[in-house]
Regions:
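C-terminal regulatory
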Residues: 1-74, 82-104, 130-137
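Short beta-strand-to-loop capping motifs
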Residues: 11, 109-111
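Short leucine-rich amphipathic alpha-helices used at interfaces
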Residues: 43, 61, 111-112, 117
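Short alpha-helical linear motifs
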Residues: 104-105, 124
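Short amphipathic alpha-helical coupling segments at ligand-binding clamshell hinges
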Residues: 113-127, 133
Length: 137
């Protein structure tokens, strides 16, 4: 695993406030953000009993825009904590729920010897990860 990270449900305090949120169902009145090509938000809602969907809709965005939209208070998002640790520490995002499952990102390469450029890239990725990207796990 290159970057270990729990999946967290987050939102900007200006969207959900600072008070306690006891269940995922309480978030059904907010728009939810989901990365294009994934089903993490939909799956999280279903796993937590919110099967009828959300009243303000599910907005699909590219990953970088999803994080920006969450910071801006445009919706609730399920994200890898490692990529938003600074936002959490600064108070721009609030962790509402955290998944207990250990998850993360892997670097997958084909079997056999890597070409020099691919090997250099893989080594760079590993150095970047070792420099602290996964420190928020």
């Amino acid at each position: 695993m290159v970057v270990p990270s729990r999946v967290v449900v987050v939102a900007a305090p200006k969207l959900v406030g600072t008070g306690p949120i006891q269940s995922v169902a309480e978030l059904a009145d907010y728009p939810w953000l989901q990365e294009i090509g994934t089903n993490e938000a939909t799956r999280y809602l279903e796993q937590n009993g919110v099967t009828k969907g959300i009243r303000k809709g599910l907005i699909s965005l590219p990953g970088n825009l999803m994080i920006d939209a969450a910071r801006d208070g445009q919706g609730v998002a399920t994200l890898a904590r490692a990529f938003i640790e600074a936002d959490i520490a600064a108070g721009r995002l609030r962790v509402l729920f955290a998944d207990d499952e250990r998850a993360g990102y892997f670097l997958v390469t084909p079997e056999g010897v890597l070409r020099p450029a691919a090997k250099a890239f893989a080594q760079w990725v590993m150095r970047q990860a070792a420099a602290g990207l996964g420190a928020g796990y």
